[in-house]
Amino acid sequence: MIEMNNISYIKGNILHGGNIPRILIHSCNCNGTWGGGIAYQLAVHYPEAEKIYTDICDDFGSELLGKCVLIPSFSDDSLLIGCLFTSVYGGSSHDTKNEILKYTKLSLMQLSLQLENNDSCIDTCLSEYNQLLISNIKHHLKDYKLEMPKINSGIFNVPWEETEKILKELKPMEFTVFSI
């Protein structure tokens, strides 16, 4: 494992985590599709979570930009899925690099507030989904380890170093980044 300030790097499959409380963070679109990259893998492994994600996107669309929504995995009590809404659309229609980076920072700042306040829903527009998370959460949010792949660097085509710079600015948050 390589450590850089508040970021640790691990080689391995992020989907094969242990039984520790963890939030698997990924960047996603507001269009309701987990169709590629890590999002596709999440859809395959956690179809109930994808259904909640799709419902949230159907209800709120682009209002989700810059927000973080925590969704239970429904199959692993120790795993929450942290959806960072960083682009309106996915695939080749994704937003610009600068927009994606801006919304990444905003959504991670919101996640920080959620962890600090043990509140799964800072944004009142998403309050109806709050109860779902509360009924499925087994630990205080601050006790969850933050894990992610190299977000934004796949389908969104943002150089990892630019997202990494944002993560470094978000101390005291600590991230574990997985690569294969």
UniProtKB/Swiss-Prot annotation:
Keywords: Hydrolase, Protein phosphatase. SMART domains: A1pp. Substrate binds at residues 12-14, 27-29, 34-39, 151-157. It is an enzyme of class 3 (hydrolase). The keyword Hydrolase applies. Residues 1-180 form the Macro domain. Its EC number is 3.1.3.84. It catalyses: ADP-alpha-D-ribose 1''-phosphate + H2O = ADP-D-ribose + phosphate. One of its GO terms (molecular function) is ADP-ribosyl-[dinitrogen reductase] hydrolase activity. It comes from the Eukaryota. GO terms for biological process: peptidyl-glutamate ADP-deribosylation. The keyword Hydrolase applies. Pfam families: Macro. Gene3D superfamilies: Leucine Aminopeptidase, subunit E, domain 1. InterPro entries: ADP-ribose_metab_enzymes (IPR050892), Macro_dom (IPR002589), Macro_dom-like (IPR043472). Highly specific phosphatase involved in the metabolism of ADP-ribose 1''-phosphate (Appr1p) which is produced as a consequence of tRNA splicing. Belongs to the POA1 family. This is ADP-ribose 1''-phosphate phosphatase.
